[in-house]
């Protein structure tokens, strides 16, 4: 929005960090004056996010969600993806877990479930030598997910599971069969299938 653009400009030129506190106080006062106006709450979340206060922003999202009961789930989902992109893996996992706790009937459950496992895969494999127990547990969780998510939603799960099997657990043949079966079942969009086939080539090379 125009207001956010202006605030962004002001914050970018805030040399000594004094403006940030003034803006926060002003928004909080507005929220107290008009508690029903969600735009001020969203502005506060945006402000915290700009300042890198992700924990505080996420707590604010939870508070709105509990108060309004509807509509905030997609905001939390988007925020979780943003946290993941900023490598805030633990906070992202927490955000998606919060959504999953709402139950399988919830409209964002599937998306949260897939993102949760995708981040768990990224987090587990981001260390130099992941613990074998962690890898086996991850493999089991991804395998269970494969039977639960819809066919067209399974790309991220398959991609993670193939990588875990082939490059961490030395289960090359299982990884190859998983890819071949998934292609046969038409689980992928054309661009996803290209990536998976390149992965298959890497595994064949490893397997020789």
Which residues does each predicted region cover?
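Acidic, polar-rich low-complexity tracts and alpha-helical solenoid repeat scaffolds
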Residues: 1-208
């Amino acid at each position: 929005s125009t207001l956010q653009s202006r605030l962004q400009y002001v914050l970018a030129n805030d040399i000594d960090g004094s403006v940030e506190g003034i803006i926060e106080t002003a928004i909080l006062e507005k929220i107290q004056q008009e508690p029903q106006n969600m735009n001020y709450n969203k502005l506060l979340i945006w402000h915290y996010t700009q300042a890198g206060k992700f924990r505080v922003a996420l707590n604010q999202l939870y508070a709105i969600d509990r108060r309004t009961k509807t509509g905030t789930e997609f905001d939390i989902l988007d925020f979780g993806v943003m946290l993941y992109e900023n490598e805030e893996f633990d906070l992202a996992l927490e955000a998606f877990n919060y959504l999953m706790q709402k139950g399988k009937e919830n409209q964002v459950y599937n998306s949260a479930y897939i993102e949760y496992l995708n981040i768990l895969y990224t987090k587990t494999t981001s260390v130099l030598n992941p613990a074998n127990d962690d890898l086996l547990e991850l493999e089991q969780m991804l395998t269970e997910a494969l039977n639960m998510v819809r066919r067209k939603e399974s790309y991220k799960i398959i991609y993670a599971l193939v990588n875990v099997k082939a490059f961490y657990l030395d289960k090359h043949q299982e990884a190859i069969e998983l890819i071949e079966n998934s292609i046969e079942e038409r689980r992928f969009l054309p661009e996803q299938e290209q990536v998976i086939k390149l992965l298959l080539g890497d595994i064949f090379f490893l397997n020789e």
